[in-house]
Amino acid sequence: MSMFCYQCQETAGGKGCTVRGVCGKNEEVAKLQDLLLYTVKGISYIVTKGNIDAAKLGNTNHEVLSSLFMTITNVNFDDGSIEKQIRKMLAVRDEMKKSVQAEGLHDAAVFSVDSRESMLKKADSVGVLSTQNEDIRSLREMITYGVKGMAAYAEHAKNIGKEDKEIYSFIYEALAATLDDSLSVDDLFALTLKTGEYGVKVMALLDEANTSRFGNPEITEVNIGVRKNPAILVSGHDLTDLEQLLEQTKGTGVDVYTHGEMLPAHYYPAFKKYDNFVGNYGNAWWKQVEEFESFHGPILFTTNCIVPPRSEEVRRRIFTTGSAGFPGCKHIEADENGKKDFSEIIELAKTLPAPDEIETGSIVGGFAHNQVMALADKVVEAVKSGAVKKFFVMAGCDGRMKSRSYYTEFAQNLPKDTVILTAGCAKYRYNKLGLGDIGGIPRVLDAGQCNDSYSLAVIALKLKEVFGLDDINKLPIAFNIAWYEQKAVIVLLALLYLGVKNIHLGPTLPGFLSPNVAKVLVEKFGIAGIGTVEDDIKLFMS
């Protein structure tokens, strides 16, 4: 049986990748990821069946987060590291199994494999299509993808020292439920919304972790040009990795630039003390093939999004860490205290040319909830006076599809009395357009990374309170969200849990939504796709 994966927005034909992932993963990697996920579901089943307290599982919780993170789109393409993780998690599962009644356990809790060949054979029977009913399958996958996004955010918070036992408990509960054939469509819909509830909790946890460690994001002008020093490019999302690299590059003559979703690191006060933290290089993740060539220096991937490099020269400059991985790229492990030695990257940087300049100027961001609340009086007055007619939440992800030019055109054609609220790499479609300001309020307010969509929800709820409204949907806020991978799924489910309706989701609706599940989302929540820029703006402004 060939691979089957439809977890990302770019899945082939909007239906599923069956030969090779559009992301670049091959059949073997896809199947190993399926088996790793199934193994984690087996652990979740044992935890749930045995009423095991997640608070007592310590490192097992961390390995579960890492395993789930490894299966997110564009995180890990390294078949060897995924196989190693499967073996590790099977050992964890088998040890845990000793504490529960052995009879009648689900296959996920008892299956065994002893070779790569047997792993791939087993994966054939446990992938997405092993659930026959398409509506049950659709809901199970939506919950699973939401949990993957939740695990990514929980791992980042854990790396900063913030954990929540309730989030671990829910991850086990939700994944175990995807193995339970007694659950109905209604049961799974309820669990989908509960996944959104825990999505809000995990984003709040990560927000607390980031701000307690690095300070509250503040309005910041970020340089997009270059200097003449050798440099390292940091991509992904993990701020603790960036912090360690900046500490280790102090005084070395090596500059550090952010890439993609790491851009918002510049907004945190703690990172402003590093004089070699120069700026942001390039654009959204999918443009990296060309931009990595012109950067010249080493690239450190702390998480997704990795695009398979097309040349050996670039591959030799790519390093991975955490849950990320790519064959042939050096992986930097943490020691038992979470410390990482980046000296090899730094020494390589010293031997390579400085980056080529691909653009000049600066961009402004740092509009997370604390900063926007500090401007609340100005924002409220702008709404009351009519200077600002509407806010557009255009958070989410960017991607390769040509149809994503819609978001650039949408931003360009919005009436001048509207403001865009954004988070995630979707911002790159319009954050360099120079859309101006309204009475000193920039027309693009960037809150940060994809998880900082939490900030946008906090801002909306605060505005609801300020204006004395009983429903978030009565605010002059429209949601036009771009999605790509599983972290966007947990953000979407969180918004649905908070009661947000009439979200437009694009550039295409998820391939994992069955017609019946999509129908319920449309009828109950008003979820819609995108149309033409002109028609959508008319609809939103009416």
UniProtKB/Swiss-Prot annotation:
The modification Cysteine persulfide is found at C397. SUPFAM superfamilies: Prismane protein-like (SSF56821). The keyword 4Fe-4S applies. GO terms for biological process: response to hydrogen peroxide. Hybrid [4Fe-2O-2S] cluster binds at H237, E261, C305, C397, C425, C450, E485, K487. It catalyses: A + NH4(+) + H2O = hydroxylamine + AH2 + H(+). Signal peptide: none annotated. Catalyzes the reduction of hydroxylamine to form NH(3) and H(2)O. This is Hydroxylamine reductase. It comes from Acetivibrio thermocellus (strain ATCC 27405 / DSM 1237 / JCM 9322 / NBRC 103400 / NCIMB 10682 / NRRL B-4536 / VPI 7372) (Clostridium thermocellum). The gene is hcp.
